[in-house]
C-alpha cells in the first residue's frame, strides 16, 4: 500500500466535511446560465444553507478603492479610398513587427542555440528602432499611396514587438524554475494572411490635421475618439471588412457581491470543463453532452469545408471558394465567442460565491504534445483552453475581492481523499478505495486540490506563526532566568 504524504491530512484538520456526493441516486439540480451550457449542482444534505435575499447579496462600498480597465467598442465607417489606405497600413504594421521579432531572435539565439546570459537583459524599444530605421524608410517608400503612414506608427509596431518579447522572456524564466517543465523560448511571427489584424494607435497624434491629410478625421466613428489619451487597439476583420477601435476606460467598483461560502477546490478536465467541491455543495460546469451538441457540430462543418477547399484531385479556383472561406471564418468565430462566454460567466459565478478558490493547473501544451492522446481529444483540450480561463478567473477575482490560488494537481486523481491511499483507477469515472470511499473521480480530485491548497497556503502559514511565537516565548523565559 502506497500513501500520498502530501494529502495524508485528515479532513478535520483542514476544516472540511467527510461528505462526497454518491455515485448512484445523486440528487442533481440544473442551474440556468442563460447561455449554451448548464451548471449542475449537488447539495450536501447534512448542511442547511441559509437563504440570502436579493437586497443583501451586494455590499455598497463607501470609499471605492478598486479601479479596473474596461474597453468600449467603437466602429469606424471609412469610405472605399480610405479602406484601401488602411489595409496598406495594417500590412505595413505587420511587416515591421515581424522585422523586429527576427532581430530580437538573433539577439537571443546564435546558431539555433539559446544564450542564457542574455535572458536577464531587458529589450529596449529605442535600440531596435535605431537598428530598423533603414528598413522603415524602404517599406514606406515602397508604397504607392499618396497618404503614407507616419513613422511613429511603425515605431508603435516595434514597441509592440518588444513588449511581447519581454513578456515571453519573463514567462520562460518563471517556468524554468520548475524542473518538470521543458518549454522552449519562442518568439512567434504574425501571419500576413490572418483574417483579423491588429494595430496599436495613439488617437491624439493621428487625429491631427497635418498627419496624412487628416485621414483619421474622415473615418466617421460611432463615438468620439478625440478624447482618448491612452494607447488603444485598432482591429480590422478581412472577411467582414469592418474596422474597430477599442477605447480604454477606467471604472470604479462600487458594489461587491457578498461571499456566501469561504473555500472551494476546482478540478479542470476534458469530460467536464470544471468540477467544483466545497463542504456545502458540488458543481459540474459544461458537461460533455453540451460540448457535443453545440461545439462538436461546428467542428464537423469546419472539417467538411476544409475537405472541399483542399482535398481535390485537380485544384481549380471556383466562384464559391471565397464563400466557403467566409463560412469557415464564421464557424471559427462562433466557437471562439462561445468559449469566451463560458469563461466569463463561470468566472463571475464562482467569484461572487467564494472568498478563496483553489484551482488545479491544467497544462494545455503538455497534453497537446502527448502522442498517446487522440487528435479529437487534443482539439477539445485546445478549444476549452483552461490556461486562458485561469487568467480570466484571476482578473475577475481581483475586481471582486476574491483570491485565486493555482495548485499543482499531481496525483490528486489517484489519491483517496479519505485515507490518502494511491489507487490505479485508469479511465473509469468512479474512484473506489479499500477504506470504503466510493465517489466520483472528479469530485475526489477537486477535494484533494482543496486539501492541498489549504495545506500549502493556510496550515503552513499557521505552523510558521506558532513556531515564531514559541521561539519568542522561549527567548523571553531565558532572559528572565538570567
Swiss-Prot record:
Keyword line: DNA recombination, DNA-binding, Metal-binding, Transposition, Zinc
InterPro entries found in the cross-reference section: Cas12f1-like_TNB, Recombinase/Transposase-rel, Transposase
GO BP terms in the entry: DNA recombination; transposition
DNA-binding listed as a keyword: yes
Protein family membership: In the central section; belongs to the transposase 2 family. In the C-terminal section; belongs to the transposase 35 family.
Protein name: Putative transposase R186
Domain of life: Viruses
UniProt key word Ubl conjugation: no
Source organism of this protein record: Acanthamoeba polyphaga mimivirus (APMV)
Binding residue positions for Zn(2+): 416, 419, 433, 435
Molecular function terms, GO-annotated: DNA binding; metal ion binding
Amino acid at each position: 500500500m502506497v500513501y500520498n504524504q502530501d494529502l495524508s491530512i485528515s479532513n478535520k484538520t483542514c476544516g472540511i466535511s467527510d461528505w462526497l456526493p454518491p455515485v448512484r441516486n445523486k440528487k442533481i439540480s440544473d442551474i440556468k446560465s442563460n447561455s449554451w451550457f448548464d451548471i449542475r449542482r449537488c447539495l450536501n444534505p447534512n448542511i442547511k444553507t441559509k437563504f440570502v435575499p436579493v437586497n443583501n447579496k451586494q455590499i455598497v462600498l463607501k470609499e471605492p478603492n478598486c479601479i479596473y480597465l474596461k474597453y468600449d467598442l467603437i466602429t469606424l465607417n471609412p469610405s472605399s479610398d480610405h479602406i484601401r489606405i488602411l489595409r496598406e497600413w495594417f500590412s505595413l504594421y505587420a511587416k515591421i513587427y515581424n522585422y523586429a521579432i527576427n532581430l530580437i531572435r538573433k539577439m537571443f539565439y546564435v546558431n539555433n542555440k539559446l544564450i542564457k546570459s542574455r535572458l536577464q537583459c531587458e529589450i529596449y524599444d529605442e535600440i531596435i528602432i535605431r537598428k530598423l530605421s533603414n528598413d522603415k524608410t524602404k517599406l514606406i517608400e515602397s508604397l504607392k499611396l499618396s497618404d503614407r503612414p507616419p513613422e511613429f506608427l511603425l515605431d508603435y509596431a516595434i514597441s509592440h514587438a518588444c513588449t511581447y518579447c519581454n513578456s515571453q522572456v519573463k514567462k520562460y524564466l518563471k517556468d524554468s524554475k520548475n524542473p518538470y517543465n521543458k518549454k522552449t523560448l519562442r518568439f512567434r511571427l504574425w501571419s500576413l494572411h490572418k483574417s483579423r489584424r491588429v494595430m496599436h494607435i495613439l488617437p491624439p497624434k493621428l487625429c491631427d490635421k497635418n498627419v496624412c491629410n487628416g485621414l483619421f478625421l474622415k473615418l466617421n466613428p460611432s463615438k468620439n475618439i478625440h478624447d482618448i489619451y491612452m494607447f488603444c487597439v485598432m482591429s480590422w476583420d478581412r472577411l467582414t471588412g469592418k474596422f474597430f477601435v477599442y477605447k480604454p476606460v477606467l471604472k470604479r467598483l462600487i458594489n461587491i457581491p457578498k461571499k456566501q461560502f469561504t473555500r472551494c477546490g476546482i478540478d479542470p478536465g476534458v469530460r467536464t470543463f470544471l468540477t467544483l467541491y466545497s463542504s456545502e455543495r458540488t458543481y459540474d460546469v459544461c458537461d460533455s453532452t453540451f460540448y457535443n451538441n453545440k461545439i462538436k457540430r461546428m467542428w464537423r462543418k469546419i472539417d467538411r469545408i476544409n475537405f472541399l477547399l483542399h482535398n481535390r484531385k485537380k485544384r481549380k479556383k471556383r466562384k464559391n471558394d471565397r464563400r466557403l472561406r467566409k463560412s469557415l471564418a464564421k464557424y471559427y468565430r462562433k466557437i471562439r465567442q462561445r468559449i469566451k462566454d463560458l469563461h466569463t460567466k463561470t468566472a463571475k459565478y464562482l467569484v461572487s460565491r467564494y472568498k478563496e478558490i483553489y484551482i488545479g493547473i491544467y497544462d494545455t501544451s503538455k497534453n497537446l504534445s502527448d502522442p498517446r492522446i487522440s487528435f479529437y481529444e487534443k482539439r477539445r483540450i485546445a478549444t476549452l483552453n483552461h490556461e486562458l480561463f485561469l487568467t480570466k478567473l484571476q482578473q475577475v477575482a481581483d475586481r471582486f475581492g476574491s483570491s485565486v490560488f493555482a495548485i499543482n494537481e499531481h496525483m490528486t486523481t489517484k489519491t483517496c481523499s479519505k485515507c490518502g491511499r494511491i489507487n490505479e483507477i485508469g479511465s473509469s469515472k468512479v474512484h473506489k478505495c479499500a477504506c470504503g470511499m466510493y465517489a466520483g473521480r472528479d469530485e475526489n480530485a477537486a477535494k484533494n486540490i482543496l486539501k492541498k491548497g489549504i495545506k500549502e497556503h493556510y496550515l503552513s502559514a499557521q505552523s510558521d506563526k506558532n513556531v515564531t511565537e514559541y521561539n519568542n516565548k522561549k527567548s523571553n523565559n531565558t532572559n528572565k532566568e538570567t
